[in-house]
Amino acid sequence: MQHHPLPEYPRPALRRDSYENLNGLWQYAITGSAGLPAKWDGDILVPYSPETKASGVGRTLQPGTWLHYHRSFVPPAGTGGRVLLHFGAVDYACAVQVNGHLVGGHRGGYWPFVLDITDALNPAGHDRLWVAVQDPTGTGVQARGKQTLRPGGMFYPAQSGIWQTVWLERVPENYITELTVTPDYDARTVTVKAHTSLPGGAANLWAVVRAGGVTIAEDWGSDEADRDGAVTLHIPEEHFFPWSPDSPFLYDLTVGTTQGEEEQRDTVHSYFALRKWSCAPDAHGIMRFCLNGKPILLNGLLDQGYWPEGLYTPPSDGAVVRELQTIKELGFNLLRKHAKIEPQRWYYHCDKLGLIVWQDMVNGGGPYKLWFVTYLTNVFQPLLRRLPDARPLWGLLGRETEAGREEYARELEATVKALQCHPCVGCWVPFNEGWGQFDAAGAVEAVRRLDDTRLVDEASGWYDQGGGDVDSLHNYFYPLRVRPRSRVVALSEYGGIAWPMPGHEPPRRAYGYGTAKSRAELTARWKKLQLETVLPQLKKGLSALVYTQVSDVEDEVNGLFTYNRAAIKPDPAAVRAVNQALEAAFEKIVE
């Protein structure tokens, strides 16, 4: 593992020229108190959690203990303005000091945050950074996904602390803190609003749109922009290139603000796409997902985003790109990002490659009664999948406390705000299989208040309350029978055929849904499932497929890839051929 991992710019949707990456070797200590450790335990490779092999530590942070990080740093070149310290994600709660001064903190293990550290910097240099972290894992109500201190089966080792890139940038005194970019497919426009650090906003906002390096729209500080801090640019018809999996066109966007002196100017670079999601009946009156007004078969994989050496954190940006490119080459166009939020670069690569993402809200809440929420409901799903998620059920689902419900509302808003800039995100998934579920109808309303341009899968699997855009089925055990409904039907989890590929076996007991004994058997069973079980249901309304899963994960050996992504387990040519057959059948059905 390199000593300066993941050097790439971490925030592609809001880029500046100033950038100083702080990934690399830091000092660390795990103690029983929040105070500065008397001594350090050794080095840790940031941004890998201490539980991972890649970190060089291999220790688990227990609830009630503290993980401390320390390093020296040099601020980005230049003078004046402000110096900002960015964290891609820290799990779960942290306090940050620079040169002994508390500069801020954060709670929430999946979302980026930024701290202005200018006033704490040492004029003579020799700046030092200290981060103290706590992570309650399963003892709290916070979002935690599949993390557990007792891994096995469908739950995986906990990870904690810094797990995404840490970086610095120098900005003007009045700088752009956030861009709100709102494309309108039907109007062929994009509206840009810049939020700035000082009261009064941007005194003068300008924006330029380029397509393939050619300037196609610009506004250099109109009166309209001056009044409301936003500007709308019109895309010429000859440069109207809708985004889709077959043609994932991205427009380049440059935005700037000026306010008198040169040092008050700020310029950022971004991008956007023109695309539109909807649900509408096909030629036979059956409800379908539509992208840019045309029915589309969403054919994809469940993606949990784990890596053997780094758990949540990939070994390199290149490894991420290779995985996503291979998924696309196999003929898939969809990934359901399950129980995790990825670093911004992951979504950027999906934007570029044309991979649609259904994004789960990361599950949290108190302890789940798994005998009820997972095992009993899975076995008796036809009877239980539409149980009302009213208050009497909240204790079984881990949402009995007001604090847990408030935490979920905060996390939902943070997720939508963090990811709504990415064209690849096509659907929000508030709940999965009842884990931490409560008032799913209210969650749908909350999502749509934040973002009404995307689909919503209210409750993936079960405890479906009849809302959102998707009738979302999980089926591993029963014959698949689909019938047209008022919402679009998605098979949002299925398959999961296990095969522990020789040389890539899991460290503990293998886990999956039925086991193949060879590559040939795995390929044959996968083809049979897709062509004999799934394909006939397309004409009955099935419009989205999410096979479990992208890769093996810890004990789970039901991936199409091995855990290290070194091999594709079924025959790749067969996978491509089957996906082509599904696409051809769907196109014929909806004609």
What are these regions (language model features)?
Residues 170-200, 283-288, 582-590:
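Surface beta-strand/loop "capping" patches
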Residues 179-180, 254-327, 581, 586-588:
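N-terminal carbohydrate-binding accessory modules
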